[in-house]
């Protein structure tokens, strides 16, 4: 059984160059780590994935990216993510996170935590 994680996040075209680079770097890092099976990116119909992602990722890691489109001029809601997970990712280990969160070995700590069963749980990571 493949118990790696499916990460879900949102991508939007930030007008701030530094912020845009930070978001792209997080997506890149999350695609490279072995603990992720897929990275589902929610973005509107008018937004394109930055070409820099395909330039820096291997073909195998780039294929982890799955784009889910939604109507223009609308940000994704928690309901959008939960509905998508229920319809398309039943039985998967899913994590919803802000688009600027990058993971390393932390995902193994979640998956291997004692006295914590991932089954029937949905993990959402954000910051205050």
Model-predicted segments: where are they?
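N-proximal low-complexity "stem/linker" segments adjacent to membrane-targeting elements
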Residues: 1-24
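Hydrophobic targeting segments
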Residues: 3-9, 30, 38-41
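Short acidic, S/G/P-rich loop/turn micro-motifs used as interaction or catalytic elements
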Residues: 12-17, 47-48, 100-104
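Short, acidic, metal-binding catalytic loop of nucleotide-sugar glycosyltransferases
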Residues: 20-37
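Active-site-proximal specificity loops/subdomain of glycosyltransferases
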Residues: 42-94, 105
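Acidic donor-binding/catalytic loop of UDP-sugar-dependent glycosyltransferases
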Residues: 96-114, 124
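Short beta-strand-to-loop element that shapes/binds the nucleotide-sugar donor at the catalytic cleft/hinge
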Residues: 120-128
